[in-house]
């Protein structure tokens, strides 16, 4: 008696398990054995065998399945011949028997038939040692399911070395160590299961009681309407174009399914998925520009159509639960798809081409998008690609393409919720993405605008929401433009390359966060702020290799500008062309720019300018006009080709302290205009190619304090003070290693 547990992975990657048991009776001349096999009866899928087709007026499917068989086999064997006359200890045995395997599931035929085999065995071979064995075997079996099967086998048994020489076994002892003979496999079979109803995988609708429409259908629009609620209508293009002068009006829950397309259907019982196709794809043409070719209803679906002409290819009003999928819509007088009212449904994988080109119309127009999905669509050569007439308050608009449209790729009036992500807009006549009103919420992320004739992304204002991970590439105007105030929200991780300006802000910045954005190789400014910054955070942005300034600011009176980097720009790294009267400007870096590293082109009257670095710039590290207040502290200018800190106009107030100017080719600190007030203290000028400090004049109603500064190893004077003296601090300024005037 014996038992085994078997595990098998089939060619379809299904795992099966079985237990087997048996017994055998052996003598010198005879063999008799019986085996039984009990597998797991669980059905496994074979998707490659799934099939779907029309049966009567229904679409049905049969699921491919694989099952293991239970069964038994037996055989009787006899010694046929020995070979005493040869030098080999050998025998020849023959076996006959049969097998029976079955599974009671529908469609699985029993597997039964005869089996015969023969074995030639050689024992105790001199070159392999006592206990060795070589067996040559052949087997043949036949059944109606698998047909004729033949196998051959060669086995070699070699004894392992032990203590001393092994002894030869007797003939009966050798029989007791024969391998157990059983079916080592788990018997499997694959069939298609019974017919079952099918559902459209896309919507879950059962595909039954079909109505068929083709070019020969009389009064097809009435036939379509009469099919009723939740009906399925199959359009077949085998007989040519289906023309309509009145349009097809959907019932609630009705499905219009086009032939000639392969769609996924799901078995109602098995859950298996099969591909279904029928006939040819139809072209449904609206012959009048005053009618909509299809008018949708709630829960209705249209799949796979080629729709041409009409006023709108598809129209709907206040729809929910609908599906528009894999249609091609072209040549509509107005819009490919036009949906009025509040819209919540699914619009996926459609193509809109050449719609609305004689007017300002669109591939897809939605009035209010409140939920659902608009994804995977392509809109090209229309007036506008995608047009949201009023508001996006929910849902997802993702992975759509707008290209070669006459005007904007995406026109969005306003956005208060939902997400717009992963879309591409390129080669359009106006903007890639245009927002007509303030963005107050939602997520706008990972979109691409490239090679558009105007702006890549053209926003109005931003009061909330997130704009992140978008790319503006090679657009004729600014990559990102904001034409109203920024009061809130987050603008982060966006990239602008090879545009006019990279990022353009036309109005005030009062709040929000602008962080981690990159502007590179744009024709003009990397970041251009045309009006006031009075709040919010602008941080960790990068401007490299732009044709004009890396960062161009106007007035700055509040908020934080920190940890930004400007490198290799054509003019200034960072420039303020308006007054700095408040806020914090800190931790910024400007290196290798073609003019000044950081330029303040108007009055500094307040705020804090601290811990910034300007190095390796072609002109000054820091360039200031008049200083009337504020704090300029702990900044560093090093290795610039002119002055480290250049003060071009009167200093009458404020604090300039703890700054470092080293290794610049001009003065460390250059005060060309009168110093009339303020505090200049604890600064260090070292290793500059001219004097450490150049002061043209302490003059006016002088209240200046010039104290505890240091000048070290400058090529000319440590302190070059031409006229006058500060109100306080003379004698506190020190230095060493300068050509002269180490102390002041």
Language-model features: where?
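N-terminal extracellular ligand-recognition/capping segment immediately after the signal peptide
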Residues: 230-271
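Right-handed parallel beta-helix
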Residues: 297-383, 387-394, 403, 411, ...
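Glycine-rich beta-solenoid repeat tracts in large extracellular/virion proteins
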Residues: 247-250, 274, 289-296, 312-318, ...
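Right-handed parallel beta-helix/beta-spiral solenoid domain characteristic of secreted/periplasmic
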Residues: 256-311, 356
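Flexible, glycine-rich linker and terminal segments associated
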Residues: 40-95, 101-108, 113-115, 121-217, ...
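Acidic Gly/Asp/Thr-rich repetitive segments characteristic of extracellular carbohydrate-active
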Residues: 208-242
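All-beta strand scaffolds that present successive hydrophobic residues in beta-strands
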Residues: 256-257, 301-303, 321-325, 344-348, ...
């Amino acid at each position: 008696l014996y038992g085994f547990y078997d595990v098998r992975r089939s060619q379809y990657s299904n795992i099966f398990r079985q237990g087997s048991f048996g017994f055998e009776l052996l003598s010198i001349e005879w063999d008799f054995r019986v085996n039984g096999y009990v597998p797991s009866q669980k059905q496994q899928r074979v998707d490659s065998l799934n099939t779907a087709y029309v049966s009567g007026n229904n679409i049905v499917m049969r699921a491919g399945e694989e099952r293991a068989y239970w069964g038994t086999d037996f055989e009787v064997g006899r010694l046929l011949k020995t070979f005493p006359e040869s030098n080999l200890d050998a025998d020849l045995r023959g076996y006959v028997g049969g097998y029976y395997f079955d599974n009671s599931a529908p469609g699985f035929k029993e597997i039964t038939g005869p089996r015969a085999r023969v074995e030639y065995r050689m024992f105790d071979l001199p070159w392999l040692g006592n206990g060795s064995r070589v067996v040559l075997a052949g087997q043949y079996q036949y059944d109606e399911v698998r047909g004729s099967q033949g196998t051959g086998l060669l086995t070699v048994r070699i004894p392992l070395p032990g203590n001393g020489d092994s002894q030869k076994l007797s003939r009966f002892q050798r029989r007791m160590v024969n391998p157990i003979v059983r079916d080592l496999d788990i018997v499997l079979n694959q069939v298609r299961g019974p017919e079952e109803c099918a559902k459209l995988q896309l919507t879950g609708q059962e595909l039954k009681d079909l109505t068929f429409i083709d070019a020969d259908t009389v009064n097809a629009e009435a036939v379509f309407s009469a099919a009723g609620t939740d009906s399925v209508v199959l359009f077949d293009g085998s007989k040519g174009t289906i023309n309509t002068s009145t349009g097809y009006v959907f019932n609630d829950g009705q499905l219009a399914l086009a032939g000639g397309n392969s769609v996924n259907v799901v078995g109602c019982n098995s859950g298996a998925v099969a591909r279904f196709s029928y006939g040819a794809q139809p072209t449904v043409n609206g012959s009048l520009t005053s009618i909509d070719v299809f008018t949708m209803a709630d829960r209705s679906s249209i799949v796979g159509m080629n729709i041409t002409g009409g006023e709108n290819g598809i129209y709907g009003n206040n729809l929910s639960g609908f599906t528009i999928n894999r249609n091609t819509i072209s040549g509509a007088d107005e819009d490919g798809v036009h949906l009025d009212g509040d819209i919540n449904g699914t619009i996926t994988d459609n193509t809109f081409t050449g719609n609305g080109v004689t007017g300002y119309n669109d591939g897809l127009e939605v009035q209010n998008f409140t939920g659902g999905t608009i994804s995977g669509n392509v809109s090209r050569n229309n007036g506008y690609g995608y047009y949201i007439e009023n508001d996006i308050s929910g849902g997802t608009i993702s992975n759509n393409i707008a290209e070669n449209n006459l005007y904007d790729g995406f026109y969005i009036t306003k956005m208060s919720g939902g997400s717009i992500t992963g879309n591409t807009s390129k080669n359009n006549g106006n903007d890639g993405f245009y927002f007509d009103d303030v963005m107050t919420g939602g997520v706008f992320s990972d979109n691409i605008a490239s090679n558009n004739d105007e702006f890549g992304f053209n926003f109005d204002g931003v009061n909330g929401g997130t704009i992140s991970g978008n790319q503006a590439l090679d657009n004729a105007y600014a990559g990102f433009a904001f034409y109203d105030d920024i009061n809130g929200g987050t603008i982060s991780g966006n990239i602008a390359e090879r545009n006019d300006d990279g990022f353009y802000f036309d109005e005030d910045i009062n709040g929000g966060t602008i962080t981690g954005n990159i502007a590179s190789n744009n024709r003009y400014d990397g970041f251009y702020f045309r009006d006031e910054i009075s709040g919010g955070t602008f941080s960790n942005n990068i401007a490299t290799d732009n044709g004009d300034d890396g960062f161009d600011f106007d007035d700055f009176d509040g908020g934080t500008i920190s940890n930004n980097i400007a490198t290799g720009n054509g003019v200034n790294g960072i420039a303020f062309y308006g007054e700095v009267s408040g806020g914090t400007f800190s931790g910024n870096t400007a290196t290798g720019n073609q003019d000044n590293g950081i330029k303040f082109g108007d009055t500094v009257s307040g705020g804090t300018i601290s811990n910034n670095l300007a190095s390796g710039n072609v002109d000054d590290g820091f360039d200031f006009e008049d200083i009337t207040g504020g704090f300029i502290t702990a900044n560093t200018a090093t290795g610039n080709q002119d002055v480290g800190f250049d003060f071009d106009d009167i200093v009458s107030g404020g604090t300039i302290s703890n700054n470092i100017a080293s290794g610049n080719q001009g003065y460390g600190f250059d005060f060309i205009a009168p110093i009339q007030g303020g505090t200049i203290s604890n600064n260090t000028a070292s290793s500059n190619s001219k004097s450490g400090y150049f002061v043209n004049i302490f003059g006016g109603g002088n209240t200046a304090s010039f104290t505890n500064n240091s000048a070290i190893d400058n090529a000319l004077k440590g302190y070059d003070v031409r006229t006058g003296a500060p109100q306080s601090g003379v004698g506190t300024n020190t230095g060493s290693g300068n050509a002269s005037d180490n102390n002041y």
